[in-house]
C-alpha cells in the first residue's frame, strides 16, 4: 500500500498501532471511568486480530508496535498482561512509561514481564499530584492532559534512570 511504502521510504523503525475504535481519548465529555472494557472473549479475538496484522506488517518488512494507552481498551497493567497472553509473539509492544504509570501500573514490573516483546519506547513522565487529584468518574482523558498529567522525563514522578537501566538490562 501507499502508506506502507511511505513508512519504508521514511525509514520508520516501526508502525505504532494505538487503538482508536470505541475509545474515549478524544471525548472531553467521557470520564476516564467510562472507557471501553473488553471481556475475555473480546480480548482473545482482539489479540488474534492484532497478531495477524503484526504478522502481515512484518511480512512487508515493517514491524508493528502495539501502544497501550489511557482511555483505550488496553490501558492497565492487568489488561496489557491479558492481551500479551492472548496474542502471538509476532505482536511487539510499545512500552509507554507515562501511560502505564497513569493507569496505575508498575512500570518496572511491566518491563520485566514483557521485555521480550518491547520494540519501541515512549518516554513521557507523569505528574503524580495531578493524577492523584483526578476524579476519574468526572474527568476525561483530555481534562487530565490539559491539567498537566503528562510532562517530559525528569519533570515528573517517574524514575527514568531506573526505567532506562531496566530496559537496557534486557538489551
Predicted segment positions?
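Short, intrinsically disordered, charge-balanced linker/junction segments flanking boundaries
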Residues: 1, 143-145, 156, 166-171
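Active-site acidic/histidine proton-transfer and metal-coordination neighborhood
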Residues: 2-93
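Short amphipathic alpha-helices and their capping/turn segments at secondary-structure boundaries
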Residues: 2-13, 106-119, 161-169
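Context-gated lysine
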Residues: 8, 35-37, 49, 113, ...
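Broad hydrophobic/π-residue packing in well-ordered secondary structure
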Residues: 14, 98-101, 160, 171
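Short, small-residue-rich loop/turn micro-motifs
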Residues: 19-21, 125, 171
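Glycine-rich S-adenosyl-L-methionine
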Residues: 43, 155-162
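Acidic/histidine-rich catalytic cores of soluble enzymes
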Residues: 51-152, 157
Amino acid at each position: 500500500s501507499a502508506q506502507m511504502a511511505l513508512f519504508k521510504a521514511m525509514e520508520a523503525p516501526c508502525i505504532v498501532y494505538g487503538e482508536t475504535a470505541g475509545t474515549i481519548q478524544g471525548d472531553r465529555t467521557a470520564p476516564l471511568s467510562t472507557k471501553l472494557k473488553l471481556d475475555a472473549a473480546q480480548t482473545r479475538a482482539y489479540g488474534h486480530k492484532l497478531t495477524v496484522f503484526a504478522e502481515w506488517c512484518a511480512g512487508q518488512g515493517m514491524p508493528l508496535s502495539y501502544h497501550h494507552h489511557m482511555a483505550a481498551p488496553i490501558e492497565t497493567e492487568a489488561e496489557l498482561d491479558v492481551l500479551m497472553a492472548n496474542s502471538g509473539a509476532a505482536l511487539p509492544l510499545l512500552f509507554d512509561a507515562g501511560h502505564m504509570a497513569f493507569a496505575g501500573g508498575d512500570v518496572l514490573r511491566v518491563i520485566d514481564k514483557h521485555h521480550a516483546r518491547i520494540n519501541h519506547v515512549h518516554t513521557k513522565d507523569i505528574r503524580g499530584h495531578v493524577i492523584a487529584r483526578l476524579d476519574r468518574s468526572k474527568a476525561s482523558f483530555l481534562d487530565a492532559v490539559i491539567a498537566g498529567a503528562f510532562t517530559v522525563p525528569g519533570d515528573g514522578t517517574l524514575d527514568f534512570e531506573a526505567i532506562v537501566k531496566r530496559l537496557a538490562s534486557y538489551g
